[in-house]
């Protein structure tokens, strides 16, 4: 039985991994392109038209990526995927938020900015963030601890998208190591 339907924009880091996340924690998540014919109720259910957006068979609705990820993990069989301790869970949420806001904003400005000036400013911001991230990963195997958590999976998704847009990670060896290791996680491999 389907645990939830999640409306997504396909081929984006915020949505592509949610079905695989659900599978990993023992839940069947159906993802639907929010612009498809199958999504006829999307606008009625979610008038702000923002994705991802989750709805369960009993009508529970949830928006915002971090809330959706935490809900799926908490309802699944592997709650430790968000961290085992209060500190790990808080740190994991911190990194999810960092990537979902700071990094996505800079990357989006670089990839889709309306003019060259904004694209260059966004690129400089993204490169500064990559330096910060690389330094952090020089002291920690993953973002929160030595276990892959949801923030690591989401970060991998964002880095993969950045590579598709031509971002060169060769100056960030710890980011390259990180992406190589996380690419082997079942959530990524089952996408």
UniProtKB/Swiss-Prot annotation:
Lineage: superkingdom: Eukaryota
Enzyme Commission code(s) on record: 2.5.1.18
Domain GST C-terminal: 85-191
GO MF term set: glutathione transferase activity
PROSITE patterns recorded: GST_CTER, GST_NTER
Signals that turn on the gene: By O-dinitrobenzene.
Record family assignment: Belongs to the GST superfamily.
UniProt-recorded name of the protein: Glutathione S-transferase Y-2
Source species: Pichia kudriavzevii
């Amino acid at each position: 039985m389907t645990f939830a339907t999640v409306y997504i924009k396909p081929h984006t880091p915020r949505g592509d991994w949610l079905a695989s996340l659900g599978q990993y924690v023992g839940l069947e998540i159906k993802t639907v392109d929010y612009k498809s014919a199958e999504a006829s109720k999307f606008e009625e259910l979610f008038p702000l038209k923002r994705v991802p957006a989750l709805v369960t068979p009993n009508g529970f609705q949830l928006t915002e990526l971090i809330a959706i990820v935490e809900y799926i993990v908490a309802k699944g069989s592997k709650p430790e995927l968000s961290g085992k301790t209060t500190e790990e869970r808080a740190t994991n949420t911190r990194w999810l938020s960092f990537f979902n806001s700071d990094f996505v904003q800079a990357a989006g400005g670089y990839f889709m900015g309306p003019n060259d000036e904004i694209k260059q400013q966004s690129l400089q911001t993204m490169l500064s963030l990559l330096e910060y991230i690389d330094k952090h990963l020089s002291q920690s195997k993953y973002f929160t601890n030595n276990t892959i958590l949801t923030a690591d999976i989401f970060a991998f998704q964002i880095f993969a998208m950045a590579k598709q847009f031509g971002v060169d990670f060769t100056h960030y060896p710890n980011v390259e190591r990180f992406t190589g290791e996380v690419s082997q996680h079942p959530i990524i491999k089952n996408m």
